[in-house]
Each structure stands twice: as C-alpha cells, then as structure tokens.
Amino acid sequence: SENTLRNWLKKGRKYLDRMVVELKRIALEKDAVVNCDETWCKVRKYDRYKKCYMWVLVNKAERVVIFFYEDGSRGRDVLTNFLGDAELKALMSDGYNAYVFIGDGLKTHRYKDTDHQVCLAHVRAKFVKARMEGGDKRADVFLDNINRLFRFEREYDREMITDGERTRRRQGLPTMEAMINLRANLLQELKSEEEQKSCYMREALNYLHKFWNEAFTYIKDGRYPISNNLAERAVRPFTTKRKNSLHFGSDEGAEIAAVYHSIISTVKLQGRSAWDYLGKFFTGIFNGCRDFLSLTPQNIDLAVCQ
C-alpha cells in the first residue's frame, strides 16, 4: 500500500540522510567547481497544492549530485543556507537573481572569491528565440559566433586534452576573435534604434550585456563548464514527471524525494546501478556499518564493513 511504501521510504531516509551529508561535504570541498539549478514542483500545503521549488547542485569532478529543498522557497537564502561556508572556485547557473550575489564583494563577503558563471547556452537560446520567433536576422551573427565557441569545446572534448591545455586554447586567438566579434556587434546593436528590434532581440541583447563577464568566465580555467547542461539534465526527471502530474503531499515528501534523488542521481552519474548500490548500502547498514564515507558510491566496493 501507499502507507507501507511511505513508511519504508521514511525508514530508509534515516540512513540516507547521513549519506547525503557525506556527499554534500565531498561536493562542496574547497575550490570545487559546481553547477546549480532549480525547478518547480507541486506540494500540498494547507489543503491546496502550491508551486514550490527543488534545487540541485552538481560537482562533475567528484560525480556527485545533491538535491535540496527548503519549504519550497526559490529565495537566495535556500542557496546560502545550503552552501554555508563553502569556499567554491566557481558556481555555474542561469541568470536568475538568486545567484547574482556570487562573486560580488559588494553584495556578500562570504562568496566574493567564488567565480559566478552564467550559462552560455542560455544566452544562445535567447538569440535563437529572437531569430525563430522574432524573425530578427541580426541574431545570426551572434549565433554564428556563440556556436563557434561551442564547436571549440566539442573539439577539446574529442581530443581529451588536459584542463591546462583547455585553458590555454580557450585564451587563444580563435576564441578571442569570436568574443571580439560578439562584443562589437553587441555594442553596435545596443546603440541602434529600439523600434528596429523585436522584443525577443532586445531581451537577448540585454541579457548578454548584463551577464557578459559571467558568460565568458569559463575561459579563465579549463575546469570551468561553458554551459549549465549538467545541472539541467539532473533536474530533468522532475520536469518530465511534472507533466505527468507529479506532486508531493507535504514538504516532508519533497524532502524525502530530494534525498533519494540525490543518491540515485549520484550513482547514475558514476555509471553504476542504483538498485545495486542501494542493496549494498543497506546490507552494510544492516550489518552494523556506520562509516558512511566507506559507504559512498565512490567507495562502497572497498567497504570493510560487511
């Protein structure tokens, strides 16, 4: 029955909560580079369903995914409460206001040394919309140059170059030429008559202008991603299920979902079977193991507690 399943999920959460704490510590290690995103879900509150938000943070290098939920809020406090005193190297997001304090010493001292990245794929999507829905041909030059930058990244991936070599190439002449072309066209379009542009083109230009530095922060370090696709893929199960009337009966239900999705998504990112991992994890728990570091997906095959 649903009650039996709910009770088993609650009992499992007691131990998986501690595993998520361990995974969070790994994901937020000093100088980590992370991706972050959020998506909405329906949660029952006071006899009605309310639009609430589930957040996700991904550390690609450590192959860890953490979902977090705080009373359904999409406010900045949810992110700052989760990050705590983490000393991140960089955080990638979209241009949502809850992230803009990252790396801004005037807005917060805590994360002033963290590079805030804004997804270049989001920038591209706005120019695609200007071209397709706004019919604005002037978007083409922006799309050509942005697509050129993405082609470079695919080449680097195919060649499997080191992070250091990727940094060197990102700061080379081909990238600089594309950025110079983008900047020149951006400044030219911003000076042109507003009436000549579609509303979508104005939105794309203003977005690129506002987040220029953040969109091109990726060239500073070969470890930095060019887009936020990693986090967006992680939240996709929520967006897919939402179309099939996914909802949670309470905040507690959403919190439980965050725990299980954190574990399952982390295991999948590591190319493992979620069922296989959960079986080994709970076998270790039933046999008395409480060394949660040894029970992480990265280490469970090496666990000495059997």
PLM region spans:
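Catalytic center-proximal scaffold of phosphoryl-transfer enzymes
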Residues: 1-306
